[in-house]
């Protein structure tokens, strides 16, 4: 059995940890958001890609879901001494991966090739794909002092810590972007696809904004795991961003956002009263993944539901 997972950098990696314990890793493919990619100084950051790489290689700092567990920050601190204060702390070992990407990108190597080199270097048997080899940027339109300002998502969430009135979200350059090499084949060869519990607007939305990916998903059985429990996102700014796009911050809003492609919506047990408002199948489970057992159980629940259909 082969599956493909759509992932951002938080939420979904927990589910990936569950699936990689119950399926042969070579049968798992992951398509990852790159809409938050940016430069800090001369270093190229692809945060969601790196988080997925570290998740599969059991290196992820699972307290922050960013960077490597046990990393040191000598370079970051030394740069501060020279007057260069990085807005994001980059660990020393993590910096090596980012320098590798930066070097190859400057040589014109496509991101999909770079990620494939890195996954092999980290002894990862699963396939990991950026959503596109083309540059797509998630932009957040905010209002500040009666002025409209368009920010990169990284600037909105990291530099400003999400403290702004959000008016809208855009995916710059997505209208003409193509899926990265291998993405459409991974979807086609999968028995089913899982949209993980990442932020729908800025983690999954950029992937779906690529028309050929969305069209391919319409031909497959698609599960979507809600990142909202009750009226609260499990983590991150999903609530603020869903509200800005006109969706209610609850399970119904998640359904409305995914309704063109979702066949089975996976909701937390506490949202059992929401099914009547959705025109799709609903699987209830514990979607709050605090332990490895929680992660494995949710993955197994999805797998068992698929087998029982």
Swiss-Prot record:
Domain of life the protein comes from: Archaea
Membrane-crossing segments per the record: none
Cell membrane found in the keyword field: no
Cofactor(s) this protein cannot do without: Mg(2+)
UniProt entry keywords in alphabetical sequence: Magnesium, Transferase
GO MF annotation terms: LPPG:FO 2-phospho-L-lactate transferase activity; magnesium ion binding
Record EC number: 2.7.8.28
InterPro entries: CofD (IPR002882), CofD-like_dom_sf (IPR038136), FbiA/CofD (IPR010115)
Sites where the protein binds 7,8-didemethyl-8-hydroxy-5-deazariboflavin: 50, 89
A GO biological-process term: F420-0 metabolic process
Pathway: Cofactor biosynthesis; coenzyme F420 biosynthesis
Catalytic reactions of this protein: (2S)-lactyl-2-diphospho-5'-guanosine + 7,8-didemethyl-8-hydroxy-5-deazariboflavin = oxidized coenzyme F420-0 + GMP + H(+)
Family under the similarity heading: Belongs to the CofD family.
Self-association state and partner proteins as the record states: Homodimer.
Chain's role: Catalyzes the transfer of the 2-phospholactate moiety from (2S)-lactyl-2-diphospho-5'-guanosine to 7,8-didemethyl-8-hydroxy-5-deazariboflavin (FO) with the formation of oxidized coenzyme F420-0 and GMP.
Protein name: 2-phospho-L-lactate transferase
The organism of origin for this protein: Methanococcus maripaludis (strain DSM 14266 / JCM 13030 / NBRC 101832 / S2 / LL)
